[in-house]
Amino acid sequence: MQAIYRSWDEAVFSDYLTRLAVPADKKFKDFSRGMKMKLAIAVALSHSPRLLVLDEATGGLDPIVRDEILDIFNDFTRDESHSVLISSHIVSDLEKICDYIAFLHRGRLMFVEEKDLLYENYALVNMTKTQLSGMPKGSVLGSRENSYGAEVLMLRSDIPAGMVPERTTIEDIMLYMAREER
């Protein structure tokens, strides 16, 4: 790899191989998808990068290995000059390591927001179908009707007095916004 990367650090690479339990005596063609991903991450981190661009970096990995890799990314970003741009369908991974989250749905950017502000600004509200039909246009960001009424995603600032907001998750926000787009 020294021929490819000017700042290649063999010692760092060796440390990552050990930390990620990548076998040195196995041929690459015999690696599982997870082992190939761990090797790719070790390579990516072993040449003094400032930015990692990762597509489904933890996909196909068991939860223990995923958590270990997320810890490595957290360690990497402790240096203020380092960043990670990660694309993932595993929302819990994003919740663990991201400061900002962008949500793309069918080629449309639905939001880019600081993670903590997503929790602070959005809420789910249970209401009747009649209450839902009377909500001002634009205040309902997404809804799911059921036999009891409706569960509605709203900005906390748009929730009418007397209605009780419930904490939402980032996955809920994404699902409700995507549902409203249909």
Regions from the language model: what does each represent?
Residues 140-182:
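C-terminal coupling/interaction segments
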